[in-house]
């Protein structure tokens, strides 16, 4: 199912090929295991548009062979005319015997213009019909859209320049190979004789029966009288056979019959014919039997066949005008389409219709078909074939994804631009390790995550020897899925986990044990004898076990270490940090090869493996320890890393080693520790704390140690022991103290070519840092420079600033930036940073912090009410909400902590129904219907009010119900003849006439009479 050698991706090749056929073929991971070869075949056609500018392209997206579809042009009379068949570039039967279709996609669009046309016109409708071509009742441009009600199987009015893409999705699974109708050696007199081996499995059979005792009667005509005895719809694009018998009875002497079978295409024209009887004379008074058995090869099926008919031509030897001709007929026939019932062969069909395209334009059909092919004996001499790989995890994942395709937005027909945009989404679906960011934007994330949870555990049932390993990682499946999920304690521990050990490709191991975690804990050891802690093991098998990604289940303490790549002695090129785990004992088999064989001694003479042999570690330990790099942390286990990490140099892990030596925890401590513990019991600060802080946060961990960041545990060992919680339940309740703002670049991972000489945290570097601090106390300018460096380091932009300095050697751009920077107290600074004008940029809480604060508030409120089980972790698992009434009742009755997201409806008493009195209902109906003095409410309205009281269990209507009742009352009043007459509305006063304008005293005004 996946590629275990890839640490970042777990691609399911089959579903990737299904959704994106242009990525190439992939073997179908079912249990049909035959040696085959994979091949991609292209199909490219330039179809010329007819005079009407309309046409139809019929695709058979699931047909297992060279046939892709057919093209029809529309004539002026409104009928379609067959143009040509659409095939793959290579004729597969010429070189291969058997075939299975893996995936197929085709694109239809136009980008050319004929002479004299200056605009690209025309639109496209496309639909996938879950039936055969002959079953379509309306094939017009608009009628096609009614062929299905599924919105994911049709699109309309797509511009012909944009085009549509047809995607083939499987209609069935676990299918066998289909014979292609390949030519076979034939022995005959004619060297042109051709023999083929056609598919015989899954035939489609049509049985056609004539009406009982069909009677024919007519007068003689020169040339005979033609009638159609049989006519029925069939579907065929490959070879077929027709067999049956007819029985004729007549009382007329000298009748002669000619019978012909016609295969009719989709456009109504004849594809091919076969004579059943030629000049057969009927004997009067007896049953005249006419049997037939016809075979029509694929070579004669030049276009899709959609119907069959049997015509009878009746004549009479020596007949004269006016002679009577009559007979009775009965019988039946059967049409067998070889391979016609193979899923995808004849159904479904996809129809792409175009309209109003300029005459003479070219419509391009281009696509790819991916096959599993078994070559013929001649080609097999030079072509290597391989078995397919049975991978039920990949097969089940594909089936589950496609079973939810309507909810996941996976269509069979697409606008080409939309399909291109969805390719990134399809890559997420095919990659089990993807974080589902695009799927989350579309709302499909939860569905795919649920499907992954179902598909991944297949490993446990398929490989029983690997079942202990599958059970050991069971609690961490959510993290293996590559997305954040809540652990048992409510905190997302490892949001970037990789599905490495759950892919169904685990090597079988000769192990025997009662508990899975014992097997896992010892799986990666190389014992001196075959018995390890009572577990019978095979050393030969275990020696190769280090190639597997390990889920280690035992106690450990964690600490981050900074890794740099350097160009010279003091110029770092890139900065990164890695999390390490301290494990008790000598466990070099768990380390990457780059760390093995390297150790450092402690003051007590014990060894710490994984450190470079540089002096003595200033600690006294009671036993040996091993330091291993890790990728992820879960509740009670860690995932080891196989990255080429060099041996460690420096004192960053002293605090974690000392804690491991004193307390010896049984599970991993879910708090990273950093600090250099010296021989006097003092905890010294370490460098690059912001980089280490970002590394801890990426794994969902807090960072403990001296300094004002995350958990300040004091300046000495005694204070650390006093402040650090030793109960695992208290780890998640540790606050994030003074959590700095991490820019987006803080989460970047750098690809480092790491070697032991490149590890930069050395005693010499620490001595240099102390020397710089001493120089800063004397030289103010150097103090400023050191402050700038520490500011860059704490904000995680040292590398970015170093790269900027390389691009600005004379600091011209930096001077311009500083000259134009806002001044202290300016309006822009006050708007951005507040009244101070300077300081750390204000920011609101992150979604995770806000959610955590909400959970804490709900928990404190519940605790004040005496509900002590509602801890912040429980509230988070309960969907970030407090306990429901059912959960409270369950806790009160059983005193057991209820399961989150379980409502316990059995513990909630059903609401008692109260019946309202008739007087109460009448009073409410009268009040709602109208004011006193108006007509009484009709009985129909009283019944409506009674229904509301019944729905509300005796309570009155709510706001929405009151609105509905008022509208009902208004409607009833308008049609009630007994309603009170409406009061007349007062008429507004007529506006006074506008006085004439003020004129001069000597100017005479002109009236209407003067004008007359």
Curated annotation (Swiss-Prot):
UniProtKB keywords: Capsid protein, Host cytoplasm, Hydrolase, Metal-binding, Protease, Serine protease, T=13 icosahedral capsid protein, Virion
Region (Disordered): 970-1012
Chain positions recorded as a divalent metal cation binding sites: 30
Gene Ontology biological process terms in this record: proteolysis
InterPro entries linked: Birna_VP2, Birna_VP3, Birna_VP3_dom1, Birna_VP3_dom2, Birna_VP4_Prtase_dom, Viral_coat
GO cellular component: host cell cytoplasm; T=13 icosahedral viral capsid
Main function: Capsid protein VP2 self assembles to form an icosahedral capsid with a T=13 symmetry, about 70 nm in diameter, and consisting of 260 VP2 trimers. The capsid encapsulates the genomic dsRNA. VP2 is also involved in attachment and entry into the host cell by interacting with host ITGA4/ITGB1. The precursor of VP2 plays an important role in capsid assembly. First, pre-VP2 and VP2 oligomers assemble to form a procapsid. Then, the pre-VP2 intermediates may be processed into VP2 proteins by proteolytic cleavage mediated by VP4 to obtain the mature virion. The final capsid is composed of pentamers and hexamers but VP2 has a natural tendency to assemble into all-pentameric structures. Therefore pre-VP2 may be required to allow formation of the hexameric structures.
Name of this protein: Structural polyprotein
Native organism taxonomy: Viruses, Riboviria, Orthornavirae, Birnaviridae, Avibirnavirus
């Amino acid at each position: 199912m996946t590629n275990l050698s890839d640490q970042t991706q777990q691609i399911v090749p089959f579903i990737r090929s299904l959704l994106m056929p242009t990525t190439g073929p992939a073997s179908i991971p079912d249990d049909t295991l035959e040696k085959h070869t994979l091949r991609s075949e292209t199909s490219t056609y330039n179809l010329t548009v007819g005079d009407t500018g309309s046409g139809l392209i019929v695709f058979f997206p699931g047909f297992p062979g060279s046939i892709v579809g057919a093209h029809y042009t529309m004539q002026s009379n409104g009928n379609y005319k067959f143009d040509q068949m659409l095939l793959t570039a290579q004729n597969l039967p010429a070189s291969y015997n058997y075939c299975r279709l893996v995936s197929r996609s085709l694109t239809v669009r136009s980008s050319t213009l004929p002479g004299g046309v200056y605009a690209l016109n025309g639109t496209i409708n496309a639909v996938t019909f879950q039936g055969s071509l002959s079953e379509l009742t309306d094939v017009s441009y608009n009628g096609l859209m009614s062929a299905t009600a599924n919105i994911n199987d049709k699109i309309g009015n797509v511009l012909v320049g944009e085009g549509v893409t047809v995607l083939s999705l499987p209609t069935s699974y676990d299918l066998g190979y289909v014979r292609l109708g390949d030519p076979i050696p034939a022995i005959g007199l004619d060297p042109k004789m051709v023999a083929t081996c056609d598919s015989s499995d899954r035939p489609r059979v049509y049985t056609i029966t004539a009406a009982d005792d069909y009677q024919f009667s007519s007068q003689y005509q020169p040339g005979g009288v033609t009638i159609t005895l049989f006519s029925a719809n069939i579907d065929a694009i490959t070879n077929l056979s027709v067999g049956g018998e007819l029985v004729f009875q007549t009382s007329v002497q000298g009748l002669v019959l000619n019978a012909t079978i016609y295969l009719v295409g989709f456009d109504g024209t004849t594809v091919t014919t076969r004579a059943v009887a030629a000049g057969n004379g009927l004997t009067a008074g007896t049953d005249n039997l006419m049997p037939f058995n016809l075979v029509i090869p694929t070579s004669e099926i030049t276009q899709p066949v959609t119907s069959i008919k049997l015509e009878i031509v009746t004549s009479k030897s020596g007949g004269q005008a006016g002679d009577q001709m009559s007979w009775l007929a009965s019988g039946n026939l059967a049409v067998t389409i070889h391979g016609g019932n193979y899923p995808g062969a004849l159904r479904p069909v996809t129809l792409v219709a175009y309209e109003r395209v300029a005459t003479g334009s070219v419509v391009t059909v281009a696509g790819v078909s991916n096959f599993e092919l078994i070559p013929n004996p001649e080609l097999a001499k030079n072509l290597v074939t391989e078995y397919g790989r049975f991978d039920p995890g990949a097969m089940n994942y594909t089936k589950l994804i496609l079973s939810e395709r309507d909810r996941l937005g996976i269509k069979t027909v697409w606008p080409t631009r939309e399909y291109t945009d969805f390719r990134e989404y399809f890559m997420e679906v095919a990659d089990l390790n993807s974080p589902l960011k695009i799927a989350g934007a579309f709302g499909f994330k939860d569905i795919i995550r649920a499907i992954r949870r179902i598909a991944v555990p297949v490993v446990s049932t398929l490989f029983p020897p690997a079942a202990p390993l599958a059970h050991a990682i069971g609690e961490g499946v959510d993290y293996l899925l590559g997305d954040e999920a809540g652990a048992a304690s409510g905190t997302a521990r490892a949001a970037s986990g990789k599905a490495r050990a759950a892919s169904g490709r685990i090597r079988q191991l000769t192990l025997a044990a009662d508990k899975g975690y014992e097997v896992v804990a010892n799986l990666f050891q190389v014992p001196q004898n075959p018995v390890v802690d009572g577990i019978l093991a095979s050393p030969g098998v275990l020696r190769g076990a280090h190639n597997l990604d390990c889920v280690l289940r035992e106690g450990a303490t964690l600490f981050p270490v900074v890794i740099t790549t350097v160009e010279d002695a003091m110029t770092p090129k890139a900065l990164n940090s890695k999390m390490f785990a301290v494990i008790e004992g000598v466990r070099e088999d768990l380390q990457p090869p780059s760390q093995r064989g390297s150790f450092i001694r402690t003051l007590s003479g014990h060894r710490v493996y994984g450190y470079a042999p540089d002096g003595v570690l200033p600690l006294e330990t009671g036993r040996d320890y091993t330091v291993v790099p890790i990728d992820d942390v879960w509740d009670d286990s860690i995932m080891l890393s196989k990255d080429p990490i060099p041996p460690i140099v420096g004192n960053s892990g002293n605090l974690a080693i000392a804690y491991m030596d004193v307390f010896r925890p049984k599970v991993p401590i879910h708090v990273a520790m950093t600090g250099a513990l010296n021989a006097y019991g003092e905890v010294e600060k370490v460098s690059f704390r912001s980089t280490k802080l970002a590394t801890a946060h990426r794994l969902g961990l807090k960072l403990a140690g001296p300094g004002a960041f995350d958990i300040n545990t004091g300046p000495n060992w005694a204070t650390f022991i006093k402040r650090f919680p030793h109960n695992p339940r208290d780890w998640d309740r540790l606050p994030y103290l003074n959590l700095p703002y991490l820019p987006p670049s803080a989460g970047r991972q750098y690809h480092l070519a790491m070697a032991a000489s490149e590890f930069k945290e050395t005693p010499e570097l620490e001595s240099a840092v102390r020397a710089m601090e001493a120089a800063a106390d004397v030289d103010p300018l150097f103090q400023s420079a050191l402050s700038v460096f520490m500011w860059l380091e704490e904000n995680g932009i040292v590398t970015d600033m170093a790269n900027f300095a390389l691009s600005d050697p004379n600091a011209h751009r930096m001077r311009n930036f500083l000259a134009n920077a806002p001044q202290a107290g300016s309006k822009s600074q006050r708007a951005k940073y507040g009244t101070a004008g300077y300081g750390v940029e204000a920011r609101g809480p992150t979604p995770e912090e806000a959610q955590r604060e909400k959970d804490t508030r709900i928990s404190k409120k519940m605790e004040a009410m005496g509900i002590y089980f509602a801890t912040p972790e429980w509230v988070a698992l309960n969907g970030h909400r407090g306990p429901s009434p059912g959960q409270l009742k369950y806790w009160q009755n059983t005193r057991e902590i209820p399961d989150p997201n379980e409502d316990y409806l059995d513990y909630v008493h059903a609401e008692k129904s109260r019946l309202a009195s008739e007087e109460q209902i009448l009073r409410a109906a009268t009040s709602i219907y109208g004011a006193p003095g108006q007509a009484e409410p009709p009985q129909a309205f009283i019944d409506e009010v009674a229904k509301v009281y019944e729905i509300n269990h005796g309570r009155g209507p709510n706001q929405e119900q009151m609105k509905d009742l008022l509208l009902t009352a208004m409607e009833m009043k308008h049609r009630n003849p007994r309603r009170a007459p409406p009061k007349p509305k007062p008429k507004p006063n007529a506006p006074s006439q506008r006085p004439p304008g003020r004129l001069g005293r000597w100017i005479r005004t002109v009236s209407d009479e003067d004008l007359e």
